[in-house]
C-alpha cells in the first residue's frame, strides 16, 4: 500500500510562504495514495512557472518541459506507455497564453490523462505580470493602468472545445480537490481541473479572502452530464463555481479512437518498439559531430 512518504524526494519546495500551490501538491499526494498508485507508475509532467516546479517535488517519473509545452510532452508519454498514470501541471499563463494552442487541441483530442492548472490569475515566476486570467482593473508591471481585457473563461472554453471532464476547485477545500482528482484519474479521456491557487506575493486582489467571498459550490442535484446546464451555470456564476462541472462518458478516448482506426490496439507499449543502436553505430553517429 502506497503512503505519502513514497512520493517524497529530497528537494524542498521553494514556493513563497502562504502560496496556494502547497495545497495542490498535498491534494495530489492524497489522491495518488488513495488510488494506491506506486511512484513507478506515475508520471508528473510540467511546463514553466511557479506551478510547474511541482514536478520536481515528487518522487516519480517526470519531465520539467518548456514554456507552454507540458501537454505535448504529457500526451506523448501517455501514448508511448499507456500503463502510466500521467498528470500534467501548468499555471494559467503556461496553459492559457503561450500554451493555449496545445491546450485547445488537448481538450478536443481526449487523450486519457489528467491536466491540473494552478490558477492564480498572474504570472508569478517572472514577478507579477497580467495573465489571460487577470481581472479587469488588475494593476501589474505590464498593466500599470489596470488590465482592460476580459479574463478568459477557461471552463466554458474547455467545454466548447470538446473536453469530456471539466472540474474546478479551490485548493483550500482539500477534500473536494482530492475527490475531483480521483474522479479525473478514473475518467477515460482527458480530464481538466482548474484549481484556484492564490499568489500571496504578486496578486493581492484575488486573495484567500476574495476567493472565500466569491466562490460558490454547485447546487445539490446538479447534473454534470448536461452540457447546456454546465455552460449556463458557468455564465450565471461568472465562472466562479467549484465541483465537477461537466462530464461526457460517451466520447471515446484518443487511444480507443486510434485503435479503432488502426484495426485494433498496438500489441505492446510503444516504449518497447524503440530501436536502440549497437555501440558501433552509436559511436559512428557521435563521430559525425566531432
Enumerate the predicted regions with their spans.
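Glycine-rich ThDP/TPP pyrophosphate-binding loop and its adjacent helix/strand module
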Residues: 97-114, 118, 122-242
